[in-house]
């Protein structure tokens, strides 16, 4: 990288958070859904989009155009020009392959709620305390709010919903591919989803495997928002104390929230809840073996940074580190079962080989 390119890259890093905040505002304004309703391949001007917004602000068109231009620069939107009769040029915007993921799929899934979560004031405040956490110890989120992330979610209904929506929206997008391709749920009688949130993961699994009895297990303040679904029992509790019994236990994106000591504690509880032929099906982000400057690696590094700022001892692990957790919790078998992308993996912890 030459000096000029390095300087430009440094500027991009110094200003990079602005684009994320523009993206958040565009999501809040429902712009992507407005564009989607216009039909496939349609390109709209900022004025045409703004006409669907509840605003009388005379500057809204110009402001929105500048925001959409930012997203086009990041290839979140496509952009073309249209010549007007008065000789001026008007920019037209369309959905790109990237922005499709910020619109709702047939099952209502979208990455838009994850964007709102990651730029939420409650989350964002953590970053202002990261320096002090490095110097003086502690967790940035805890220093900002005097509570852990999960304690805070338990007392703030607004943030609890933002958190659950952000997790479930992203989860549904990824889980759909996993359920279609991973075959390890075949033959399972009772499946316990530990820290299953509001139950979307379990519902997707049972929709394909209707003979499975599902148990959605999470903290009581999370379970209270879980809808009732056929074939699923919602149980409130604490995975660090005990876990409901089943012949398979599903855990997704939980180990990344905890240090090894805490992971071993709930994994040992899972071990105790399983019969000899049982298994834990662990779906986690994992450090890719490829270059750490790839898009996939940057996603994982960003997620690792979030866990650093918000949870006690949380981090992204390597395959070898997951195998060490399995063996440390007493499981005799470990295997990499399936991967939906470069950044995640489905692993099986087998109680007995």
Curated annotation (Swiss-Prot):
The catalytic activity, as recorded, is:
3-methoxytyramine + S-adenosyl-L-methionine = N-methyl-3-methoxytyramine + S-adenosyl-L-homocysteine + H(+); mescaline + S-adenosyl-L-methionine = N-methylmescaline + S-adenosyl-L-homocysteine + H(+); tyramine + S-adenosyl-L-methionine = N-methyltyramine + S-adenosyl-L-homocysteine + H(+); 4-hydroxy-3,5-dimethoxyphenethylamine + S-adenosyl-L-methionine = N-methyl-4-hydroxy-3,5-dimethoxyphenethylamine + S-adenosyl-L-homocysteine + H(+)
Biophysicochemical property: pH dependence: Optimum pH is 9.
Domain of life, per lineage? Eukaryota
The UniProt annotation places S-adenosyl-L-methionine binding at: 218
Provide the top EC class. Answer: transferase
Q: Which Pfam families does the record associate with it?
A: Dimerisation (PF08100), Methyltransf_2 (PF00891)
Q: How does activity depend on temperature?
A: Optimum temperature is 45 degrees Celsius.
- Extract the GO molecular function terms from the UniProt entry: O-methyltransferase activity; protein dimerization activity
What is this protein identified as?
N-methyltransferase
Q: Which residues form a coiled coil?
A: none
Q: Which family does it belong to?
A: Belongs to the class I-like SAM-binding methyltransferase superfamily. Cation-independent O-methyltransferase family.
A biological process (GO) of this protein is: methylation
Species of the source? Lophophora williamsii (Peyote)
Query: What does the function comment of this entry state?
Result: N-methyltransferase participating in the biosynthesis of natural products derived from phenylethylamine, including mescaline, a natural hallucinogen potentially used in psychotherapeutic treatments. Catalyzes the N-methylation of many substrates, including 3-methoxytyramine, 5-hydroxy-3,4-dimethoxyphenethylamine, 4-hydroxy-3,5-dimethoxyphenethylamine, tyramine and mescaline.
EC annotation?
2.1.1.27
Q: What PROSITE patterns has UniProt attached to this entry?
A: SAM_OMT_II
Positions bound to S-adenosyl-L-homocysteine: 171, 195, 218, 238, 252
Keywords (alphabetical) are: Alkaloid metabolism, Methyltransferase, S-adenosyl-L-methionine, Transferase
Its quaternary organisation is: Homodimer.
Tissue-wise, where is it found?
A: Expressed at high levels in all tissues.
Pathway the protein acts in: Aromatic compound metabolism; Alkaloid biosynthesis
């Amino acid at each position: 990288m030459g000096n000029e390119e390095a300087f430009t890259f440094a500027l991009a890093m110094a200003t990079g958070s602005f684009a994320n905040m523009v993206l958040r505002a565009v999501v809040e304004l429902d712009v992507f859904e407005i564009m989607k309703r216009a039909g496939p391949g349609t390109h709209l001007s900022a004025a045409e989009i703004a006409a669907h917004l509840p605003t009388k602000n005379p500057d809204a068109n110009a402001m929105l155009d500048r925001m959409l231009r930012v997203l086009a620069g990041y290839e979140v939107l496509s952009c073309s020009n249209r010549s007007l009769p008065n000789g001026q040029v008007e920019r037209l915007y369309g959905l790109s392959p990237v922005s499709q993921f910020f619109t709702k799929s047939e099952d209502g899934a979208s990455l838009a709620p994850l964007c709102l979560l990651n730029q939420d004031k409650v989350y964002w405040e953590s970053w202002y305390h990261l320096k002090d956490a490095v110097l003086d110890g502690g967790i940035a989120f805890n220093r900002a709010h005097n509570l852990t992330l999960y304690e805070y979610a338990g007392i703030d209904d607004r943030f609890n919903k933002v958190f659950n929506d952000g997790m479930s929206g992203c989860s549904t997008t990824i889980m759909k591919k996993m359920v279609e391709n991973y075959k390890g749920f075949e033959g399972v009688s009772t499946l316990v989803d530990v820290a299953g949130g509001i139950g979307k993961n379990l519902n997707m699994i049972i929709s394909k495997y209707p003979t499975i009895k599902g148990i959605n297990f999470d903290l009581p303040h999370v379970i209270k928002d879980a809808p009732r679904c056929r074939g699923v029992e919602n149980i409130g509790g604490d995975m660090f104390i005990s876990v409901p019994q089943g012949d398979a236990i599903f855990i997704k994106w939980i180990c990344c929230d905890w240090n090894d000591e805490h992971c071993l504690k709930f994994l040992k509880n899972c071990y105790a809840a399983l019969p000899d032929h049982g298994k834990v099906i662990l779906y986690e982000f994992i450090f890719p073996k490829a270059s750490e400057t790839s898009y996939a690696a940057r996603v994982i590094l960003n997620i690792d940074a979030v866990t650093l700022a918000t949870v006690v001892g949380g981090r992204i692990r390597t395959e070898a580190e997951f195998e060490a957790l399995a063996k440390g919790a007493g499981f005799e078998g470990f295997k990499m079962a399936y991967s939906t992308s470069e950044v995640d993996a489905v692993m099986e912890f087998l109680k007995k080989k």
